[in-house]
From Swiss-Prot:
GO MF term (any one): 3-octaprenyl-4-hydroxybenzoate carboxy-lyase activity
Entries under Gene3D superfamilies matching the protein: Single helix bin (1.20.5.570), UbiD C-terminal domain-like (3.40.1670.10)
Organism expressing this protein natively: Vibrio cholerae serotype O1 (strain ATCC 39315 / El Tor Inaba N16961)
GO biological process, one term: ubiquinone biosynthetic process
Keywords: Cell membrane, Decarboxylase, Lyase, Membrane, Ubiquinone biosynthesis
Function: Catalyzes the decarboxylation of 3-octaprenyl-4-hydroxy benzoate to 2-octaprenylphenol.
Gene: ubiD
Cellular component, GO, one term: plasma membrane
Enzyme kind, highest EC tier: lyase
Alphabetical list of InterPro entries matching this protein: UbiD, UbiD-like_C, UbiD-like_N, UbiD_Rift_dom
Protein name listed in UniProt: 3-octaprenyl-4-hydroxybenzoate carboxy-lyase
Enzyme Commission number: 4.1.1.-
Location of the region described as Unknown insert in the Swiss-Prot/TrEMBL record: 460-584
Organism ancestry: Bacteria, Pseudomonadati, Pseudomonadota, Gammaproteobacteria, Vibrionales
Amino acid sequence: MNFKDLRDFLDYLEQRGELKRITHPIDPHYEMTEISDRTLRAKGPALLFENPLGYDFPVLTNLFGTPERVAMGMGRQQVQELRDVGQWLAYLKEPEPPRGLKELIEKLPVFKQVLNMPVKRLRRAPCQEIVWQGDAVDLDKIPVMSCWPDDVAPLLTWGLTITRGPHKKRQNLGIYRQQKIARNKVIMRWLAHRGGALDLRDWMEKHPGEPFPVSVAFGADPATILGAVTPVPDTLSEYAFAGLLRGSRTEVVKSISNDLEVPASAEIVLEGYIDPNEFADEGPYGDHTGYYNEVERHHVFTVTHVTMRNKPIYHSTYTGRPPDEPAVLGVALNEVFVPILQKQFPEIADFYLPPEGCSYRMAIVTLKKQYPGHAKRVMLGVWSFLRQFMYTKFVIVCDEQVNARDWPQVIAAMVNHMSPLRDTLFIEHTPIDSLDFASPVVGLGSKIGLDATAKWPAELAVSNSDQSDKTTELSLEALKACLSDEADVLDVALPEAANDKLVLLLINKQEAGQAQQLLQRVVDKLNGDSPLKFVILCDDDVNIHDWNDVIWAMTTRMDPARDSLRIVGQDLICFDATNKLPDEVEREWGTPIRKDPKLVAKIDSLWDELGIV
């Protein structure tokens, strides 16, 4: 499938019932988010809001709201075919000459596609049919969405930010959210390790104080959009990779006000510069973690020109608690990651980033184990091989027969094959996502690896505790009786897959230190006689009978080293996955995203009329 532009892709989706046009007037402020969120959770179509209240441009959301549409955008019929894309990337990351005629023939399709990597430069392009400049630049005319009740301002989300460092020939494409603060200014929120920020840093070193050119394209063709979120090798441009995906060269045109090349078919392009000395407070915004992030200082992007197609479509999205569109992209791109990892670690059978773990904070790896300690090598490899995994806090390694996408199987492997103290690896003071408010300081926190593989004799010889003689069964009734005098415990779960070795507790937390004190009392009451290996403590807003809820709480509310209580005498680990109170942490704790009940009721009344799903 070869889509020349976004409109071509939308036609394709509409023919297959994967696009819904909404003619009813809908407000970009909050209403579009509520409708898009419901549609995505129902695995519904992409949405084209043709009459946004107060604006002339239609708004496209939920474009990549299912893994299947991501695959279509990459020119594939099935999600499983995305592993072919991963094999391409693995080869391009570490190319090897063919080792014979047979391998040459096998790799001919890849070699042929390389012809599509160079860009095709146009002198005129659809994205420059209309031009705003000077006083005509007015971002207030674009239907930029406001997503959540406590968001500070409207937020541009799907723009492909195009930069070039002074020492690089190739451009960088990245997707960074942008807070609108004026008719011609937005705040560019990019993390220090991202390509755009690195280009700016190099520019500031070579051209101190000079404006840094930037262009931002909205509504490019699907291959170019997805190329910007795929882990392409540093030596490969996103435009070149888009050409590989599409099967035809990426068409670009030079920006009107700078030398940066933008997608020729983009719907809207913002051009301008970043003044290295101009900053502003960004946020708070409801983010993909399900919380509002902290306010941070970031550079301001001044827009000097806006170019667009005739009757442009504004491409947008929202981010919130999984599942959201970034989480769906994560599920699809997971298939791309597997061959890349297998190129370096052939012993990896499967690799999964659960969306409930914010798509990157937890990884499940299944392994063809070959020697003692193999699982720990793989943990360290995951953390160090690709920068996409530098923020992964939890890595669980299981044997190859375990289905990494099935929580009962993963939990069974943990309780049956782990000695919690021996088979957990803690690493402190490591890079952590700045949005992770559970880390002790911004950008720095701990990681945990859990070796849930069957142990070899050499591994069994290094044991912290022998639980083989703990034959006492632990029933749910007995556990509840044991905790009957604990008024703070609201619910108890003993999952069937856990084989009496893992318990989840729901508590009403009101005071600092309450969770840790409760965990210690639970340990004392069990008195070393129970078969328990793991205790997980959650707040009363978590459904402890739903692994999706539990994993979300663990990955958003824990710093593994700080919030793990290790009981040496009983070979037991307790995880405190509760919200931390001000006296427990120094950082500002995240506030969960809450929907406005009045807005929900309004969309309820419209829902049947919209006829989306």
